[in-house]
């Protein structure tokens, strides 16, 4: 299994629509020249962006967080260019990009250091072979202060690993529960 380069990422995005919309280079500034958190293709990965749809966790219902029986009322929906995450809380969002992962590929996604250095942790599980959809992102604010997340800017880097052999059963083959997800998707069992 080997990590894939920018050349491979560009080819797969352009020829097989692995990432849509796709940015072939690294973008570090907005069209007006303002500095942003970078996104797009990097040497051995792809920096994904956060869309402007958020679900911010709240404790207004004083419920227990249970992944098998998650209370959708624990979130407040928000749409905007900047999401403010309360202290010691978290928010969910989705990527701008839609992914179609090849059968021989597994990805690992890591948060960008710009956010990590501010106490904001981005968590995403691997994209499995033949999974497709928008990625649900989880942002944890580990600080005692409110924290900002910027929509349409970079939030995490996806690394692509290609196996030497094809898996027997892909995510699509087993009917994975998050296959084809479109918006911010809450836990399923």
Swiss-Prot record:
Record: active site: 138 (proton donor/acceptor)
Catalysed reactions listed for this entry: dCTP + H2O + H(+) = dUTP + NH4(+)
Keyword tags: Hydrolase, Nucleotide metabolism, Nucleotide-binding
GO MF, one example: dCTP deaminase activity
Class of the enzyme per the UniProt entry, highest EC level: hydrolase
Record-listed E.C. numbers: 3.5.4.13
Residues where dCTP binds: 112-117, 136-138, 157, 171, 181
Subunit structure of this chain's protein: Homotrimer.
Protein family membership: Belongs to the dCTP deaminase family.
Protein name per Swiss-Prot or TrEMBL: dCTP deaminase
Source taxonomy: Bacteria, Pseudomonadati, Pseudomonadota, Betaproteobacteria, Burkholderiales
The encoding gene: dcd
């Amino acid at each position: 299994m080997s990590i894939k380069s920018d050349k491979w990422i560009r080819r797969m995005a352009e020829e097989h629509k692995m990432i849509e919309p796709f940015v072939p280079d690294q973008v570090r500034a907005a069209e007006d020249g303002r500095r942003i958190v970078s996104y797009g293709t990097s040497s051995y990965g792809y920096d994904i962006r956060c869309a402007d749809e958020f679900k911010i966790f709240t404790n207004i219902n004083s419920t227990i967080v249970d992944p098998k029986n998650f209370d959708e009322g624990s979130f407040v929906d928000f749409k905007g260019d900047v999401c403010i995450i309360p202290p010691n809380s978290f928010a969910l969002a989705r990527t701008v990009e839609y992914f179609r992962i090849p059968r021989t590929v597994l990805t690992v996604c890591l948060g960008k250091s710009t956010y990590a250095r501010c106490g904001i942790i981005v968590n995403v599980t691997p994209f499995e072979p033949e999974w497709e959809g928008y990625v649900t992102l989880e942002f944890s604010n580990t600080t005692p202060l409110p924290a900002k997340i910027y929509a349409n800017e970079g939030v995490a880097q996806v690394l692509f690993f290609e196996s030497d052999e094809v898996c027997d059963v892909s995510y699509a083959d087993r009917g994975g529960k998050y296959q084809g997800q479109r918006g911010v998707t809450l836990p399923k069992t």
